[in-house]
Amino acid sequence: MAAKDVVFGGEARARMVEGVNILANAVKVTLGPKGRNVVLERSFGAPTVTKDGVSVAKEIELKDKLQNMGAQLVKEVASKTNDIAGDGTTTATVLAQAIVREGSKYVAAGLNPMDLKRGIDKAVVALVEELKKASKATTTSKEIAQVGSISANSDESVGKIIADAMDKVGKEGVITVEDGKSLENELDVVEGMQFDRGYLSPYFINNPEKQSAILDNPFVLLFDKKISNIRDLLPTLEQVAKASRPLLIIAEEVDGEALATLVVNTIRGILKVVAVKAPGFGDRRKAMLEDIAILTGGKVIAEEVGLTLEKVTLADLGQAKRIEVGKENTTIIDGAGAAADIEARVKQIRIQIEEATSDYDREKLQERVAKLAGGVAVIKVGAATEVEMKEKKARVEDALHATRAAVEEGIVAGGGVALLRAKQAVGNLSTGNPEQDAGIKLVLKAVEAPLREIVANAGGEPSVVVNEVLNGKGNYGFNAANDTYGDMLEMGILDPTKVTRTALQNAASVASLLLTTEAMVAEAPKDESAAPAMPGGMGGMGDMGM
């Protein structure tokens, strides 16, 4: 086992604080509308240029092991905030640095770190309550666009395209971000439920222009096994033919005699039918078939529930207004399922999302929710170069997370103003314990840090601006984009409540851990000079009688 260095007390905290400052100073230059870029080296290819706090934090690894521990703890603040709220990583880092900086002064002066921590926790609970009281629900498309713009470093085009996407697919719909082919951002919307399976035979195509099969007002047969024998299908086909309506068959596989008969009937015009494979694999396939059944108001024909193909009636089949089947995708538009059933299914999947342990499972479950809730929007990010594309894409993803957070918990005044107003509301908070009160006091001072940093990055004088904002009321704050004061909500400078709340809670949590640290154990640096010399390669060859 390698030798370890153990460092105690003030020296341990001082080294950790140095690490915190190095990381936070690199991250905080990106804060605000006039925040700067940070360039990140890549082991191959062009460097990455970013204004995303968590991207900067993730790149930082310090040489000094004790400093690095401090840096890694603050990196955790940024990552955790990003995971929960999807934005606010720079604000969280700035708050953590401010709480550590103020707190380490008190600890150095001899105050009890555990009492300080209790005070910090009480202050955070009170501030979060005030933020919730000040929160305003986001109702309009304009507010959603403003939140998106602020998160994307005041890029209005990003806010607008996200608001448009939410208008089209609803606030629960899936919105994905992809690389575009042009210089401009584009929005592509797929209405209804789409899954990645196409027709099993090109002979099903009835729209040669689009190379797709379009079924108007069709029935939908959902079967969880393979269909090879046409005899099993005949009762269903006869009933559908009598109703003079098209049929979509979704099964694990349709092949052999069954597929050949369906193709022949389609070509002869006897029956309009299309067969596709069921989406997904294993248990996920069963779940997705059940989703389609609920969306279309049908049943999954499965032996487990006592249903067989021979006994299927029209009441067991799903229905939709229109279905489009391409080579690789099938889209079900306006399924006939009951709204209450769809809502119940969505709730059920949401519970599974909360319980899911892997990111992959969570992502797949979220896709299912979106498909049931009403569509998929794809934002295609346009840029001139690959480097710009990466930077822009990261900003659009941040903005998307921020708007989702705003829809979830509402909005507060942006630009650090919400925290200052919360500070004013809890200014008289006291516990009767002087050391805990010191913890409360240091948090109330630290919440000024985001506004101070926004002003500093804009080239202003932080103390002057903070005093001016504290003298105002309500949403009165400082717009760093054009150096003016006014109502932040009217100026469209908004922050999602969830982002501000999460940033404060995570910053205080990690800062408290740092302040209550009394010893640090790290691997001792290896002494390079003590390494043994390499053995000589040609020793003993001097006397060769030359």
Curated annotation (Swiss-Prot):
GO BP, sorted A to Z: protein refolding
CDD domains on file: GroEL
One term of GO molecular function: isomerase activity
Signal peptide positions (record): none
Lineage: superkingdom: Bacteria
Region of interest called Disordered, as start-end residue ranges on this chain: 527-546
Pfam family, any one: Cpn60_TCP1
EC number, as in UniProt: 5.6.1.7
InterPro entries assigned: Chaperonin_Cpn60_CS, Cpn60/GroEL, Cpn60/GroEL/TCP-1, GroEL-like_apical_dom_sf, GROEL-like_equatorial_sf, TCP-1-like_intermed_sf
Binding site residues for ATP: 30-33, 51, 87-91, 415, 479-481, 495
Protein name: Chaperonin GroEL
Native source organism of the sequence: Acidovorax ebreus (strain TPSY)
Gene: groEL
